[in-house]
């Protein structure tokens, strides 16, 4: 599907493996508890600084969440002393507060030189936003070569659109030099809307063509209206350009709204068919609609059309279809392909599938034995070495959900469970709060167990009836 740059990545750290240095987590935890209990700011900062002084890198994620746009002084204390994390988060702070771009770039380059490979992804994103894709790819390749998964994804995505992006660069230079003609201007705006999904920039270029009812210009206007919570006005525009021009992106918007609001799959499919488009966004969504209509062969055919054009997002849908149809090998193969192209979601899916296969193998092995051994507490620990390796990579790339999942690969009471869930809790992951509650419950630490379980519940996690009673007593 079309590419969107989500700033959720801004607080995704490149975290070191949990088997490495564990210093600073006691202070980090005190700081975390202080934040959740709304303790004095001086006490909280003291704990965060102590953790950072002990070379703990996760604390910078917590500081970023807690301090927000007030964190510059904190980051300044640890410049050149934190393997690039202070520089990284100061750059994020400046980005949030509209700081000077040159300073942001210098900080990120310094961060990368100190070993924080996540900075390469952010540098690539900055140049992508300026339509300087060649420069972006230089940074993303460095991140990719270092194994930074978001760089891997973006590099492969951009590589798939190399010709388009080269043309955008060429035309954008003409726009800046004021040597672009109207035909080229229309082409540039259209490419930015359709291939980059940057509606504001695309609209700024295409608004001169609104008077001629140019579909991409009207579409960009409608997308901006939606961002302004003017959905009815946007839908009117989608209807207009679909009825008059069968514009494929308008058709996609209308079809997706039909599915979301009324589950009218038949009408949605008619709209998609009427676009007469073979763009991945259309064929991929057709696959989704056919799957919901239980026409699985047609779903597969349309998913494959998008996958053949290297649409990484649709690979996940195709893998899920194969899983639901019991075609495990096909599911594993497509998830593996998407994961190697940088998809975090594919990594999740693949790890879950590998674990399920491992559990089934163990179950079959036990069933074939005459005498089943008494169940051991270690039986609850997840077993797949392949799945664990994938999750370790996702943790290394700063994904908090993988931190939580990886903690399930350690036996009850293992200190790695605490460390992994503290990493995720530093990003306010509610499952991590619950897991910490259970960890301390098993350690007979009633105070901390109740504290984390209450926090998990307050953040919407279902802690179950047993722990509901426990925290009340």
List each language-model region with its residue ranges:
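Position-specific recognition of the canonical hydrophobic site in helix A of tetratricopeptide repeat
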Residues: 35, 95, 128, 160, ...
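Residue-level detector of the short coil/turn that links helix A to helix B
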Residues: 38-39, 70, 98-99, 131, ...
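Single-residue signature of alpha-solenoid repeat helices
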Residues: 44, 71, 104, 136, ...
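Hydrophobic/aromatic packing residues within the alpha-helices of TPR/SEL1-like helical repeat arrays
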Residues: 48, 75, 108, 140, ...
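Short helix-capping/linker turns of helical repeat alpha-solenoids
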Residues: 54-57, 81-84, 114-116, 146-149, ...
């Amino acid at each position: 599907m079309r590419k969107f740059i989500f700033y959720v990545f801004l607080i995704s750290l490149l975290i070191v493996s949990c088997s490495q240095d564990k210093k600073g987590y006691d202070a980090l935890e005190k700081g975390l508890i202080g934040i959740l209990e709304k303790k004095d700011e001086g006490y909280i900062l003291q704990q965060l600084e102590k953790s950072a002084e002990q070379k703990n890198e996760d604390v910078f994620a917590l500081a970023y969440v807690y301090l927000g746009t007030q964190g510059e002084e904190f980051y300044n204390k640890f410049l050149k002393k934190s393997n690039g994390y202070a520089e990284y988060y100061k750059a994020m702070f400046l980005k949030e507060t509209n700081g000077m771009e040159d300073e942001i770039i210098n900080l990120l380059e310094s961060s990368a030189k100190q070993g924080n490979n996540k900075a390469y992804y952010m540098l690539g994103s900055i140049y992508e936003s300026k339509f300087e894709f060649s420069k972006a790819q230089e940074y993303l390749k460095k991140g990719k070569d270092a194994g930074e998964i978001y760089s891997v994804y973006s590099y492969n995505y951009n590589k798939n659109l190399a010709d388009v992006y080269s043309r955008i660069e060429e035309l954008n230079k003409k726009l800046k030099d004021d040597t672009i003609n109207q035909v080229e201007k229309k082409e540039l705006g259209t490419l930015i809307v359709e291939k980059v999904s940057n509606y504001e920039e695309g609209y700024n270029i295409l608004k001169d063509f609104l008077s001629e009812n140019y579909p991409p210009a009207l579409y960009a206007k409608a997308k901006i209206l939606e961002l302004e919570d003017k959905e009815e006005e946007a839908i009117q525009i989608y209807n207009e350009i679909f009825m008059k021009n069968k514009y494929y992106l308008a058709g996609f918007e209308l079809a997706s709204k039909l599915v979301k609001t009324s589950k009218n799959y038949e009408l949605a499919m008619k709209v998609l068919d009427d676009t007469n488009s073979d763009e991945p966004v259309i064929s991929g969504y057709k696959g989704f609609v056919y799957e919901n209509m239980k026409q699985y062969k047609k779903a597969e055919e349309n998913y494959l059309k998008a996958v053949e054009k290297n649409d990484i997002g649709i690979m996940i849908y195709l893998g899920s279809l194969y899983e639901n149809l019991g075609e495990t090998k096909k599911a594993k193969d497509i998830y593996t392909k998407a994961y190697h192209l940088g998809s975090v979601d594919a990594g999740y899916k693949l790890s879950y599938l590998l674990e399920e296969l491992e559990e089934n193998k163990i179950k079959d092995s036990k069933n074939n034995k005459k005498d089943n051994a008494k169940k051991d507490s270690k039986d609850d620990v997840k077993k797949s070495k392949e799945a664990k390796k994938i999750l370790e990579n996702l943790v290394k790339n700063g994904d908090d959900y993988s931190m939580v999942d990886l903690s399930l690969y350690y036996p009850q009471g293992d200190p790695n469970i605490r460390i992994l869930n503290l990493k995720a809790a530093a990003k306010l992951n509610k499952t991590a709060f619950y897991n910490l509650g259970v960890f301390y419950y098993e350690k007979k630490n009633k105070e901390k167990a109740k504290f984390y379980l209450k926090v998990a519940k307050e953040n919407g996690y279902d802690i179950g009836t047993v722990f509901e009673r426990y925290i009340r007593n």
